[in-house]
Amino acid sequence: MTTVSMRDMLQAGVHFGHQTRYWNPKMKPFIFGARNGVHIINLEHTVPMFNEALAFISNIASKKGKVLFVGTKRAASEAIKEAAVSCDQFYVDHRWLGGMLTNWKTVRQSIKRLKDLESQSIDGTFDKLTKKEALMRTRELEKLEKSLGGIKNMAGLPDVIFVIGADHEHIAIKEANNLGIPVVAVVDTNSSPDGINYIIPGNDDAMRSIRLYTESVATAAKAGRNQDLAVQAEQDGFVEAE
C-alpha cells in the first residue's frame, strides 16, 4: 500500500502554511503553532489523513473507478497533468469551466466537437478548407484541448476528485458535493475544509509539496488498478478441477 512518512512531508515543506493574518479559523484543529508570522501545520494530523486518502483512492481505482485530478493554479497545473497521465486517469489543469460536472451533458457535446476536430486535423479535412476556415478550426481545437483535453476520454462522471488548493478550486468542490462525488483535497491554513471528505492539511503552493501529493496519489491509483488487473487475471485463469 502507498504511504507517505513524516520525513517525506518535512523534506517537502508540507508543514509550512500561510501568514497568520490570512488564516481560516476552521483550520485551527490542524495548526501546530506559528513561526515568524507563518502558521505551521501539524503533520501528526496530516500524515495519517493523507495515508487514509491514499488508501481510499487506491480502493476506488481497484474497482475500475475514475479519479479526476484538479489543479488549475500555476504552481499545480503541470504536476497535476503529469501525475494523471502517469496513472492513466483524468485531469483539469487549465481552468475549471462552471458546470464541468453538474452540466455533464453539455460538456459531453463539447468533447464530441473536440474529437471531431481532432479527426479532421488528422484525416486531411483541414487541408481542403480555406486558410481562414482552417485557422478558425485550429484555434477552436486548441481552445477545446486546453479546457477538455484531460477529460475527453473520461466517458462519464468521476468517482472521486483529487484537488490541489481547496480555495482556488471551490467551484469544482461545490459541484462534486452537489453530485455526491467524494472530494480529496489539500487544504492550506488560509482555506476552508468545508465540503471535503478527505482533508489533507498542507502547503498548497510549494512545488516540492505539490509533487509529493500528486505523485503519491498517482502511485496509489496505479497500485489499485494493478490490484484489479491481478484479480481479473486470477479469475480468467481459474479452471475448476473436475
Curated annotation (Swiss-Prot):
Where are the disulfide bridges? none
Q: Extract the NCBIfam families matched here.
A: rpsB_bact (TIGR01011)
Q: Name one GO cellular component term.
A: cytosolic small ribosomal subunit
> GO molecular function terms here?
structural constituent of ribosome
* Gene name in the database record: rpsB
Organism (species): Shewanella piezotolerans (strain WP3 / JCM 13877)
GO-annotated biological processes: translation
Keyword vocabulary terms for this entry: Ribonucleoprotein, Ribosomal protein
Indicate what this protein is called per its UniProt record. Small ribosomal subunit protein uS2
Q: Which family does it belong to?
A: Belongs to the universal ribosomal protein uS2 family.
Keyword Ribosomal protein among record annotations? yes
The UniProt entry, under HAMAP family, shows: Ribosomal_uS2_B
Under CDD domains, the record lists:
RPS2
Source species, domain of life: Bacteria
Does Kinase appear among the keywords? no
